[in-house]
Amino acid sequence: PAADATVAPREWQAFNVARGYLSRKINANLRYVTSWEWELALFPDSALGCPPPEGETVIKGNTAGYQFIIQPLGNPNRYDIRVTYDLQRVYDCGIAGTAPGGGNLPPPAAGSAAGGGFELGGHVLELNAGTINAMRQAKMRWVKKQIRPGDGAAFGHIAAAKANGFKILLSVVGKPEDILVPGFFDQYAGYVAELAGAGADGIEVWNEMNLDREWPNGQIDPAKYVELLAKAYNAIKSRNPNTLVISGAPAPTGAAGPGGKTAAYWNDDVYMLEMAQAGAAQYLDCVGVHYNEGIISPNQSSGDPRDNYPTRYFSTMLNRALAGFSGKQACFTELGYLSPEGYGALPGGFAWAQNVSVAQQAQWLAEAAVLSARSGRVRLMIVWNVDFPFFSGTDPMGGYAIIRPGGACPACATLGSVMP
C-alpha cells in the first residue's frame, strides 16, 4: 500500500525521516512500501536502544523517540528504524525479522540478462519473407511468439529466428485450468528451462494473469503467480543465465473499481503491487507491461476524450507498472495502436479507436520507441502486432497489425527512421 498521511503530522514527518534514511541505506525507492508500523515511546538511552554510530557517546536515561518497522516492496525484511522526538537523529536497529511467508520462496538463481540497451521487436503470426523484410525495415531485433507449455513447435521458432538474425521472445501461457493441476508449476518450469537451453533469448512467464481467461475465476492471486515465476526463473537461469526472464504482463484495466478486485479480474496496478509485495522482483529481469488502448500521441499525458485513467497514456502506464519495482526496467511485451483503416467499422467494444488512422499508428509507434529508449526505463518494446490478418466482431487484432491490408507498412518506415 502507499504510505500516506493518515497519522498526526509530527509522526508523519518522523516517518519520512526514517523512510528517507532506509531508502538511502538499501538504495531503493520507498514511495510505496509493503507495510509500516510506528510507536512513540521512551527508550533507555540517547541512541533509542540501537547501536550508536562509531564515536558517538551514548547517554543513559529515558529518551523520547519514534520506532518504525518498515517492510519495503519486494523485500521480506522488516527494518527497525528509530527517530528522536525532535526529528534530528536517526538510529538503525537493523532487521526486526522477516515478513510471514517470506521464506516460502526459493533463493533466486544467478543470471546476467538484466539491464542492457533498448531494443525493438514485433509479435508475428508467421516468420516469412514478408514479415522478415518488414521487421528489418523497422530495425526490429526481436521476434515474439506466444506458445502453450509443452509445444514442440517452439524449438522450430527458435531455430527460424536465429537463422534470420533475430533474437526470440517466447511468451509461454497455459490454460486457466492448468493452474489447478498438481505438479503443473514444476512441469512448466521444466519446459521453459528446455527453451532456455535451446537458445530462447527471452521468456515471458504467463500472460494477463489478472483476468479469468488466463487464471482460474475466483482464484486470481499474485502471490500464487510469484510461486510459478520463482520456479520458472530458477529453472531458466540454471540452463541459460543469459535468457531474459520477463514477468507476465497484466491486462491494463480499471474495471474492478476502487477496490481493484473481483472474482473475474483485478486492476493491473493492484495486481502488480501485490506481485511486488510477494517478492516478484527477485525472480525477473524485466517487468512485463502491455499498452494497447492509446488513441492519442504517447507524448501526451492528458487530453484523452474518454477520461484520464492512467492506462490511457503511455507515460502513466509505464509509471503504474514500475511503481512497485524500483531499479527494474520494463519490457513492453505488447504495445500497439488500433486502427480500423482498410477494414471498416470496429466492433462495439473497440469503437474507442474508430478514428485512429494508419498514419497516426505509424507516428505513435515511432514516438513510443523514442520515449522508451530515452527513458532508460524500458529494455524492450514488442510491437503488437506485425502481421495478424484477423478482424472479427469480437477481436479486431488485424487493426493492430503494422502490415496493413494490401501489404503496406507505414510503421516500418517510421520505426526504421528512429531506431539505430
Predicted regions and their residues:
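N-terminal low-complexity, Pro/Thr/Ser-rich intrinsically disordered segments
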Residues: 1-22, 97-119
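Short, non-transmembrane alpha-helical segments in secretory-pathway proteins
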Residues: 4-48
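Exposed beta-strand-loop-beta-strand "reactive/processing" segments of non-cytosolic proteins
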Residues: 30-83
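A short, surface-exposed interaction/processing loop segment used at functional sites
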Residues: 76-102
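Boundary/entry segment of secreted carbohydrate-active catalytic domains
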Residues: 103-150
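Structural recognition of the beta-strand scaffold that forms the well-ordered cores
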Residues: 119-124, 141-147, 167-173, 201-206, ...
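Noncatalytic carbohydrate-binding groove/subsite architecture in carbohydrate-active enzymes
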Residues: 155, 159, 163-166, 170-176, ...
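Structural recognition of alpha->loop->beta junctions
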Residues: 191-205, 269-287, 372-378
